[in-house]
Amino acid sequence: MTRKCQLLFKTSNTANKVSHSNHKSKRLQFVNLQKKKVWSSLKKKWIKLRISTKMIKILNKKNIDYFL
């Protein structure tokens, strides 16, 4: 399974790992993904999603049906 948010489509970010001697090497910063069950009032059932924590905060303010 890819490390991608199913609603925002956020993916990993490339960054530099910097040592004490200032030597830089590439590394990945992964998205903070969580498994979440969300109730859809349109479909009248639970939907299992793998979404980022940013999306969880958005879903607390808006309904899942806004994104479907």
From Swiss-Prot:
Keyword Cytoplasm: no
Similarity remark: Belongs to the bacterial ribosomal protein bL28 family.
GO molecular function, one term: structural constituent of ribosome
Keywords annotated in UniProt: Chloroplast, Plastid, Ribonucleoprotein, Ribosomal protein
Gene3D superfamilies with a match to the protein in the record: Ribosomal protein L28/L24
Subcellular compartments: Plastid, Chloroplast
Domain of life: Eukaryota
Protein name listed in UniProt: Large ribosomal subunit protein bL28c
Cellular component, GO annotation: chloroplast; ribonucleoprotein complex; ribosome
NCBIfam families on file: L28
GO terms of biological process kind: translation
Main location: plastid
Pfam families: Ribosomal_L28
